[in-house]
Amino acid sequence: MNPPESSPLGKASACVDQYDATLLFPIARADQRAELGISGAAPFFGADLWTAFELSWLNQRGKPQVALAHITVPCETPRIVESKSFKLYLNSFSNTRFADAAQVQARIRADVSAAVWRGAASAGSVGVTLLGPDRFAQELMQELDGLSLDRLDVQCTQYQPAPELLSAQHDAAPVSERLTSQLLKSNCPVTGQPDWASVQIAYRGPPIDQEGLLQYLVSFRNHSGFHEQCVERIFMDLWTRCQPIELTVYARYTRRGGLDINPLRTSHPQGLPRNMRTARQ
């Protein structure tokens, strides 16, 4: 068992510049999900989309190479990797020689897969894509699509998750809506540092009260939780209180330490969106 308090997060850490897979610090999802009343298989699908902006290694002649990395971690994995440990792990590539980018990509895939699937009855694999400088121009920027809840002039008084703010018109005809907000903010449960995010909520079902939904999202402002847990809490609260037929919650968190984490949870299996950053990322 690796409690978050034992991770390198919030502590002084030596900068290791020789490849070291043991720097990865897995944290069990089950502990966080138990707080949401989830035991056993989770009632959703999805993944955590990571972007690593600070990845470098040496080629066989000692010349530095750089790349962006997109990592896709299925939400079915029993563990996540604590973000600072992942940064330290990537830093450990910086003075290590590799034959080519494909070898680096394969090493990251193998190491992260082993960390997040640790303890599973059957292990799977994470997705890893490296983009070299010749492809940097293909990395576009796009905001989350949907009707902005932030247009609403609501009074906000609660800054801890308040699911009682959520409601839906269960006697009305089902609708399909895609709603967004730039106002999601929570705090790291270990360091207390702020985590800022844009969030998109797509659903089909009874019309959700938009003012209450915005107030609910704002209520995370002083909440302590990892990115993945916050998105799962939002999903579970909406699923329980508003009872949509279909639901997808997708948040894109601003970058910290050269990494951004973008969890998506959905009630029905679907293709993942392109990992495309927003302006604040």
Curated annotation (Swiss-Prot):
Designated name of the protein: NADPH-dependent 7-cyano-7-deazaguanine reductase
Pathway: tRNA modification; tRNA-queuosine biosynthesis
EC number: 1.7.1.13
Superkingdom, taxonomy of origin: Bacteria
Region: Disordered, residue numbers: 261-281
One Pfam family matching this protein: QueF_N
Chemical reaction(s) catalysed: 7-aminomethyl-7-carbaguanine + 2 NADP(+) = 7-cyano-7-deazaguanine + 2 NADPH + 3 H(+)
InterPro entries hit by this protein: GTP-CH-I_C/QueF, NADPH_dep_7-cyano-7-deazaG_red, QueF, QueF_N, QueF_type2
GO annotation terms (biological process): queuosine biosynthetic process; tRNA modification
GO molecular function: preQ1 synthase activity
Function: Catalyzes the NADPH-dependent reduction of 7-cyano-7-deazaguanine (preQ0) to 7-aminomethyl-7-deazaguanine (preQ1).
Keywords assigned: Cytoplasm, NADP, Oxidoreductase, Queuosine biosynthesis
Classification via PANTHER family: NADPH-DEPENDENT 7-CYANO-7-DEAZAGUANINE REDUCTASE (PTHR34354:SF1)
Gene Ontology, cellular component aspect: cytoplasm
Locations listed in the record: Cytoplasm
